C-alpha cells in the first residue's frame, strides 16, 4: 500500500513538472511590443465623442479645456517575432473627426481569427496572465461633452459628466462617478458601480449593478442583481432578477421570476408580477396608491402606523391572506368561481391612501403595521 502511494506521488510530481516546463519555456520566448498614439481636437457644446474598443480599458476624465485629448496605448504579446509583426499589422487605432463628431476605434484587421482571439482574451482577462492583446484609452474631455463608449472584454472608468452618455459594455467593469445628463447604459456579463444618475435607460443582462442616487430610471433586465440607494421614478421590465431598493418614490413595471425588495416606499406603485416575490419593509404614511397584480408572487407589506388606507384585495381561494390584527375594518365576499374579495380600511381616521392587490393564483400575502 505504501509503495503504491509512493509511485502515485512520483507520477503526479512528474506530470506537474512536465506541465510546467513547456509553460516556462513558452513564457521565456514571448515577444512584446508597446505603441502609444495621441490625438487632440477642439470641442464645443455640440461635439460628440465616440470610443469603440476591445480588450482593454477606457478611462474618461474631465478637464476645464474646450478640447478633447485621446491617448491610446497598445500592448501586444506573441510567442515569436514573426507572429508579433503580424499582430502589429493587424491592430491599429482609426481616428475620425468631422465637424462636431470625433471617433476613435480599435481596428483588428484579421477578422478570420476573431472568435479565437475573443475566447483567448476572455481567458487572459480571467487569469490576468499572458495577455495577447491589450488596448487602453485615456480620454480627457470638457464636462459638458456628449460621450458614446463601447467596450468588449475590458473596463470603463468615468469621471463626472454633464453631457449625454451612451455606454455599451460587455465582459467588463463599469465604475462611474456622477452622470448628470440623460444616459443609456447597456451591460452584459458585467459589474457596475455608479455614484449618481440623472435620467437613464438601462439594459442589464447577467450583470451586477450598484447605484447611488437616481432621478428617473427605465430598466430592462434579466438574470441580474441590482442595488439602488434612492430613486424618484423607477420603471422595470424584469426577468429572473434580484432587486434591492433602499428608497423609491414611484415604482412601475413588470417582472417574471424576480425578487423585489424595497426598504422605504413613498408614493405610488403599479406592478404586474409573475412568480417571485415583493417585499416592502416600510410604506410611508400618506402614500397615494399601491396596485400589485400577483400571479404566484408572494407579497409582504409593512405599514407605518399613521397610515390610513382604503384597501381592495382580490385573492385566489388557495392564497393565504393575513391582514393587520388591529386598526382594521374588513368585509369578505366570494368573487367568481375561485376567488374571494376583501375590502375595507386600515388605520385610524379618514383614509387618504389606496391599496389594491389582485392575487390571481396561489400565493402568500402578509400586510401588517410596524
Give, region by region, the residue ranges found by the protein language model.
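Intrinsically disordered, low-complexity terminal regions
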Residues: 2-370
Amino acid at each position: 500500500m505504501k509503495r503504491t502511494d509512493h509511485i502515485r506521488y512520483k507520477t503526479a510530481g512528474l506530470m506537474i513538472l512536465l506541465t510546467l516546463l513547456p509553460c516556462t519555456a513558452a513564457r521565456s520566448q514571448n515577444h512584446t511590443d508597446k505603441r502609444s498614439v495621441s490625438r487632440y481636437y477642439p470641442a464645443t457644446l455640440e461635439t460628440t465623442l465616440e470610443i469603440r474598443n476591445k480588450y482593454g480599458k477606457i478611462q474618461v476624465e474631465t478637464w476645464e479645456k474646450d478640447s478633447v485629448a485621446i491617448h491610446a496605448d497598445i500592448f501586444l504579446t506573441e510567442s515569436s517575432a514573426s507572429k508579433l509583426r503580424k499582430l502589429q499589422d493587424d491592430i491599429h487605432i482609426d481616428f475620425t473627426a468631422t465637424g462636431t463628431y470625433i471617433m476613435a476605434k480599435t481596428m483588428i484587421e484579421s477578422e478570420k481569427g476573431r472568435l479565437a482571439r475573443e475566447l483567448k482574451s476572455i481567458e487572459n482577462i480571467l487569469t490576468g496572465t499572458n495577455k495577447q492583446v491589450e488596448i487602453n484609452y485615456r480620454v480627457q474631455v470638457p464636462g459638458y461633452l456628449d460621450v458614446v463608449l463601447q467596450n468588449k472584454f475590458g473596463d470603463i472608468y468615468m469621471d463626472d459628466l454633464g453631457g449625454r452618455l451612451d455606454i455599451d459594455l460587455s465582459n467588463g467593469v463599469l465604475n462611474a462617478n456622477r452622470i448628470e445628463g440623460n444616459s443609456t447604459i447597456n451591460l452584459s456579463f458585467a459589474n457596475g458601480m455608479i455614484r449618481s444618475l440623472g435620467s437613464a435607460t438601462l439594459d442589464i443582462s447577467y450583470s451586477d449593478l450598484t447605484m447611488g442616487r437616481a432621478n428617473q430610471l427605465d430598466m430592462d433586465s434579466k438574470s441580474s442583481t441590482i442595488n439602488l440607494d434612492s430613486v424618484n421614478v423607477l420603471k422595470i421590465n424584469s426577468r429572473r432578477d434580484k432587486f434591492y431598493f433602499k428608497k423609491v418614490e414611484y415604482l412601475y413595471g413588470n417582472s417574471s421570476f424576480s425578487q423585489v425588495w424595497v426598504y422605504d416606499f413613498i408614493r405610488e406603485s403599479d406592478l404586474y408580477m409573475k412568480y417571485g416575490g415583493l417585499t416592502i419593509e416600510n410604506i410611508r404614511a400618506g402614500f397615494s396608491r399601491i396596485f400589485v397584480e400577483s400571479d404566484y408572487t408572494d407579497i409582504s407589506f409593512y405599514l407605518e402606523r399613521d397610515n390610513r388606507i382604503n384597501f381592495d384585495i382580490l385573492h385566489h381561494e388557495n392564497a393565504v391572506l393575513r391582514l393587520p390584527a388591529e386598526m382594521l375594518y374588513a368585509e369578505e365576499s366570494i368573487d367568481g368561481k375561485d376567488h374571494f374579495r376583501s375590502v375595507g380600511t386600515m388605520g385610524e381616521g379618514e383614509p387618504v391612501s389606496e391599496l389594491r392587490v389582485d392575487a390571481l393564483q396561489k400565493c402568500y400575502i402578509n400586510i401588517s403595521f410596524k
